[in-house]
């Protein structure tokens, strides 16, 4: 069993509220639009970090992270990208990527809208944590914590 802190779209902003929100998780995943490496350094100071770069990320961030991250967490196959869409309206190439990968969990960001939904057609859980940063059209900063237990996902606040 592993607890995960998930955020996206920090756009160079990280603060004590976010760091405190993640203090009890095992790993932090960042779904892109990090902004700068200072965000990553602050997250890594408290927990191990997995991340992908997003469309606003420059050369420095892109030199440390990939566009697509595929990995296994507690027997769950995970695919993480920044621009991914959502079930029924995936970004170009994403549905094919998910089908080929055998993913059980798809994580993305970009929309600045927190959304957790199950894709009944592909049999994949989709999680977008919304935006944890200050830049954008969102009114509320969001992030999410969940537990991966074998092939189960338990979301908690």
What is each PLM-predicted segment?
Residues 49-57, 98-100, 125-131:
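Short Pro/Gly-enriched beta-strand edge/turn motifs at strand-loop
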Residues 69-70, 115-118, 142-146:
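Short beta-strand scaffold segments in enzyme catalytic cores
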Residues 77-111:
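Internal catalytic-core helix/loop-beta-alpha segment
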Residues 2, 73-74, 101-102, 127-157:
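Binuclear metal-dependent phosphoesterase catalytic core
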Residues 12-16, 35-39, 56-62, 85-90, ...:
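Active-site environment of divalent metal-dependent phosphoester hydrolases
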Residues 1-49, 57-75, 80, 139-142:
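N-terminal active-site segment of His-dependent metallophosphoesterases
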Residues 43-46, 98-101, 121:
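Short, conserved loop/helix-junction motifs that constitute active-site signature segments
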Residues 52, 82, 105-106, 112, ...:
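Acidic/histidine-enriched, beta-strand-rich ligand/metal-binding domains
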């Amino acid at each position: 069993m592993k607890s995960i802190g998930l955020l996206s779209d920090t756009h160079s902003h990280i603060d004590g509220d976010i760091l405190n929100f993640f203090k009890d998780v095992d790993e932090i995943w960042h779904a892109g639009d990090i902004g700068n490496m200072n965000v990553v350094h602050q997250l890594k100071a408290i927990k191990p970090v997995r991340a992908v770069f997003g469309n606003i990320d420059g050369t420095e961030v892109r030199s440390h992270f990939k566009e697509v991250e595929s990995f296994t967490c507690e027997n769950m196959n995970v695919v993480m990208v920044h621009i991914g869409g959502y079930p029924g309206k995936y970004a170009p190439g994403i549905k094919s990527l998910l089908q080929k990968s055998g993913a059980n969990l798809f994580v993305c960001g970009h929309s600045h809208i927190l959304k957790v939904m199950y894709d009944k057609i592909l049999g994949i859980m989709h999680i977008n944590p919304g935006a944890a940063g200050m830049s954008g059209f969102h009114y509320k900063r969001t992030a999410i914590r969940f537990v991966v237990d074998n092939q189960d996902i338990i979301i908690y606040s």
